[in-house]
Amino acid sequence: MSDSLRIIFAGTPDFAARHLAALLSTQHHIVGVLTPPDKPAGRGKKLTINPVKELALTNNIPVYQPTSLKPEENHEWIKALQPDVMIVVAYGMILPKAVLDIPRLGCLNVHGSLLPKWRGAAPIQRALWAGDTETGVTIMQMDVGLDTGDMLYKASCPITHQDTSASLYAKLAELGPKALINTLDLIISGELKAEKQDDSLANYAEKLSKEEAKINWSLSAQQIERCIRAFNPWPMSFFMLDDQPVKVWEAQVIASDNTNQIPGTLLKADKTGIYIVTGEGILNITKLQPSGKKPMASADFLNSKRDWFTPGKIIQ
């Protein structure tokens, strides 16, 4: 097999663009890029190009932006490029079997978990929320299922008690490109060994919703604190205070026997934070963001809104 593969790259966000950038520094030939149509963004709703398209145009790579890959006529662009392999990273569209079968070596996906754990749309956030101590990336041979294909390569990293989705995303954005290039090297050398997934060990990382981000004080302080880190930077955990949403950026778990207190009860608010009773333990909110304001230390917020935080008040 030639040392240089003809690659079509399919992706959208910065996470994907980092993988494309890594491939551009190799001996492989990126013959085309698939990415979704430009979307309106900002107040003016101007059409904006995503990071993958921007990188492709900078490097004079042909770009194709179909609204769907289901129509057969949309497959002709892919066929004409005669790819050895298609690499898919956070593309955001379904690839039908007819597309998966076009490249000589099929389609590879970079998935942000250690499969078969956390198949689905939000593996980074769900791993954090669940309290996992380890995650990573899996390079997978795509099939028609949802992240069910054979595993080709894995790279892992620890999840710390300080990690947010943003910091974990950054870790995986470092791991993924290296794992992908190693996988391609193994394919070329003929040393790659595929491993089937054990479906009995699989679980699903469902897409996040804004509704989930509202803090449920009946959960334990530990669960809520993990949720706060998992939902940072989107959609951001929040609570309601005098009918205003307040986003929570940072919090601490305080062990306490508070079984006689209603979850959501405000215990105290001082320069060290805002202490709220949960289903188990106390949550100390140390950094928050009132509606229409920038994130700030809780102590700074209290300077102007101390009257909002009367001990005994129930926080919604």
From Swiss-Prot:
HAMAP family: Formyl_trans (MF_00182)
Protein name: Methionyl-tRNA formyltransferase
The protein's role, per its UniProt record: Attaches a formyl group to the free amino group of methionyl-tRNA(fMet). The formyl group appears to play a dual role in the initiator identity of N-formylmethionyl-tRNA by promoting its recognition by IF2 and preventing the misappropriation of this tRNA by the elongation apparatus.
Keyword hit for Kinase: no
GO CC field: cytosol
Species annotation: Proteus mirabilis (strain HI4320)
Gene that specifies this protein: fmt
Entry EC no(s): 2.1.2.9
Source lineage: Bacteria, Pseudomonadati, Pseudomonadota, Gammaproteobacteria, Enterobacterales
Keywords noted in UniProt: Protein biosynthesis, Transferase
Sites where the protein binds (6S)-5,6,7,8-tetrahydrofolate: S113, L114, L115, P116
Domain of life of the source: Bacteria
GO molecular function, one term: methionyl-tRNA formyltransferase activity
